[in-house]
Amino acid sequence: MSVSMRDLDPAFQGAGQKAGIEIWRIENFIPTPIPKSSIGKFFTGDSYIVLKTTALKTGALRHDIHYWLGKDTSQDEAGTAAVKTVELDAALGGRAVQYREVQGHETEKFLSYFKPCIIPQEGGVASGFKHVVAEEHITRLFVCRGKHVVHVKEVPFARSSLNHDDIYILDTKSKIFQFNGSNSSIQERAKALEVVQYIKDTYHDGTCEVATVEDGKLMADADSGEFWGFFGGFAPLPRKTANDEDKTYNSDITRLFCVEKGQANPVEGDTLKREMLDTNKCYILDCGIEVFVWMGRTTSLDDRKIASKAAEEMIRSSERPKSQMIRIIEGFETVPFRSKFESWTQETNTTVSEDGRGRVAALLQRQGVNVRGLMKAAPPKEEPQVFIDCTGNLQVWRVNGQAKTLLQAADHSKFYSGDCYVFQYSYPGEEKEEVLIGTWFGKQSVEEERGSAVSMASKMVESMKFVPAQARIYEGKEPIQFFVIMQSFIVFKGGISSGYKKYIAEKEVDDDTYNENGVALFRIQGSGPENMQAIQVDPVAASLNSSYYYILHNDSSVFTWAGNLSTATDQELAERQLDLIKPNQQSRAQKEGSESEQFWELLGGKAEYSSQKLTKEPERDPHLFSCTFTKEVLKVTEIYNFTQDDLMTEDIFIIDCHSEIFVWVGQEVVPKNKLLALTIGEKFIEKDSLLEKLSPEAPIYVIMEGGEPSFFTRFFTSWDSSKSAMHGNSFQRKLKIVKNGGTPVADKPKRRTPASYGGRASVPDKSQQRSRSMSFSPDRVRVRGRSPAFNALAATFESQNARNLSTPPPVVRKLYPRSVTPDSSKFAPAPKSSAIASRSALFEKIPPQEPSIPKPVKASPKTPESPAPESNSKEQEEKKENDKEEGSMSSRIESLTIQEDAKEGVEDEEDLPAHPYDRLKTTSTDPVSDIDVTRREAYLSSEEFKEKFGMTKEAFYKLPKWKQNKFKMAVQLF
């Protein structure tokens, strides 16, 4: 559609350029912008245009346009608003969805912009009304309807307005009463309290009293007596009588009309199909309660205005005041519209393939052309933000039939594609220790063991009182949280579980389980040492990809293969994975285009292969749904512009961000549905409410109220954990907040979750724990290649057998400040004086240590201390002393870090005395004294150094520190 700027109203210039809400009021047929201070105020005699601009994850802006018609607005103003909305859409590029909003029948999406409610005021521009603050407060009665958003309507202040089904708010001069009809739900009552808070803040400066009255309690308390006194005393309420607002319209019958020359002509057809819509025309789809206007991409601005008028007339003539009109442009159809059609092929974004570039580059390289410039890969996409601490404790079990086997620490990250696993990960959260219990299903695993794994994980969660989060993960669909937990993750072909062995025996298929002496090919992927994977693939040339590094081995040879589009990071990860897959064999490097014959022989010869990097489902903008699950039927309702307050403790909610599904379960949900939370998540994927072709293997998380981890709360603009620490149902909690001036009051401290599952002890055995990498300060700059001295010190703080990585783990960003409650000081953990003192003493002397479980060291902001009584003065002195020691320890660590970073990469130029290898190695029975134990190799003679390391000292010190450490460990000099 080509549009001249002369056809567009100048009031819309520059509109929709940034996220937010913009509103115009129709004044003398001209859209006039209203100031930000007036956003949310509507007058019954006016018509408005509301533009909501949303910034999407893709960086694009989405526009939704609503035109709101007050109950007393004139037909001319309403018509102007409808036409100007079409012009605004044209000014924005013709992509916006347009909604007709009638006072009292607004869409939930529209009301979500103005939470908790809108209360239109009498008057308007046409009547010359000027808003003046009344000197005397007028007693008003409002009816509230809605479970997720609230429709508020002022009704006559009379007993006849009340009924048992709705909730009413009586706003008097000194007190606000909420009357809860006996047939209203807890959720509706809780939402109505948000309106009470709004009225209290807006019309009473937040100072008046609030009271609730329960329908049927007669004169049980003073508040009830006072409430009924305004109505002349108590009397039974009449039954609700049906009126025009309560009429329902058949939405099962849908009719399609084509608009030509201002007339809506029926389109014949038994079923609706996408092919019925012509891009050169406009159509009306009448669904009773909803009327859609579909406008082809090539239609003119006048055609669109005419179609909109025809739809308005259709609604008006059939007397359907509640019907909503939605106008959509071809290519930007909404989910409700597309769902009316039998088949609708949704356009997908095409990705540019790297195949052509890779093949041409490889051909040129074989012809002797320098392809260095051609081989530069496209800028890497930003790595997803990590929202989980990776310094926690991990336990992993392999499922064998109906039983599970605990894995040794060395095997925690080595999975088989034919097996299922259960894992438990305990880690420091923002306010308490958090636990994630999950299952991982290999692609070749059997259904029986998958069911066993889910049952085992669910029982673990249930035994811990539903505090941990639960995850269901499939091979190939792992989220970033899982990879960060596992760190060096390897997936082998085949399996060793009883279920897998039984399956291949019954099916009489070959067992391709990984054999370290056989031919195996691994694809290396990841973003760094804390997130790297080696995936075993078929040992054939077609499995190669120019964007990756590979490891290929048989019983006697090891090759690394570098694709032309791979990076230096990929090379580093391949070197690290070699340490795990083939630690004792020297590898031979192969570059794409210059491979040896032996390399191709192991792969069975050359073949065509891809060069396009494998991509995972991207995370999309989150959508929140409220769920009801009865008789195996799942019903969902989308909550727009959601906040934490939309989560009701009696209900189950789902956040859908396409790549992952989060099922949130309130504390007051019935026990039966708590146990079915994972099933509800699976049913949601099957339902595919957004028609986005959700993968049935998408990760599902089950999150219990009160145990929300950071990777869940990140979807909310703010999060207050004290709200879930309150007792009672949603209504009782909201009432406490309203009566407390809008501040949540925690009834009890959060329970600290146990560190592990099973047995009598809550702490796992050290032998079964994998030592984790750790970061000494969450605010430290990322340091590459820590030196042996620093690594040795870090190892002391973790455990004696700690595994050293070259980089600290990713820092988990604190999303929200800790919630402050009147009793928060009571919940703060006690200072670990003895631990700090003992660790500080390590700098002078390291005494023999008893076996202990490695615990993460995590810096946390200091909290103000409340003054203690005089009797505790001795304890205060001890605490001050310990704080000094802690500060000293931190400063020494930072100082050492700076010194070691400065030494990074410095060659050995000192004139040190030479000592024999037998006296320098760590296991020596006659060790040399007075040497730097972090540089034992420097005291070797040049000849013995070359014999042990296979290189000169000069070449050795040019290697990165992590590689130096690897060589030193191999010869017992580290």
Swiss-Prot record:
Residues 872-887, 912-921 have a biased composition (Basic and acidic residues). This is Villin-4. One of its GO terms (biological process) is cytoplasmic streaming. Residues 738-783, 801-833, 845-930 are annotated as: Disordered. Gene3D superfamilies: Severin (3.40.20.10), Villin headpiece domain (1.10.950.10). It holds the Pfam family Gelsolin. It is found in: Cytoplasm, Cytoskeleton. Gelsolin-like repeats lie at residues 29-79, 150-190, 262-305, 394-451, 532-572, 634-675. Disruption phenotype: No changes in the primary root length, but shorter root hairs. Increased sensitivity to latrunculin B (LatB) and instability of actin filaments. Residues 824-833 have a biased composition (Low complexity). Residues 909-974 form the HP domain. The keyword RNA-binding does not apply. One of its GO terms (cellular component) is plasma membrane. One of its GO terms (molecular function) is mRNA binding. CDD domains: gelsolin_S1_like, gelsolin_S2_like, gelsolin_S3_like, gelsolin_S4_like, gelsolin_S5_like, gelsolin_S6_like. Binds actin and actin filament bundles in a Ca(2+)-insensitive manner, but caps the barbed end of actin filaments and is able to sever them in a calcium-dependent manner. Involved in root hair growth through regulating actin organization in a Ca(2+)-dependent manner. Belongs to the villin/gelsolin family. Preferentially expressed in vegetative tissues. Detected in the whole seedling, hypocotyl, cotyledon, primary root, roots hair cells and trichomes. Expressed in flowers but not in the silique. Keywords: Actin capping, Actin-binding, Calcium, Cytoplasm, Cytoskeleton, Phosphoprotein, Repeat. PANTHER family: VILLIN (PTHR11977), VILLIN-4 (PTHR11977:SF138). Residues 888-898 have a biased composition (Polar residues). The modification Phosphoserine is found at S777, S787, S890. InterPro entries: ADF-H/Gelsolin-like_dom_sf, Gelsolin-like_dom, Villin/Gelsolin, Villin_headpiece, Villin_headpiece_dom_sf.
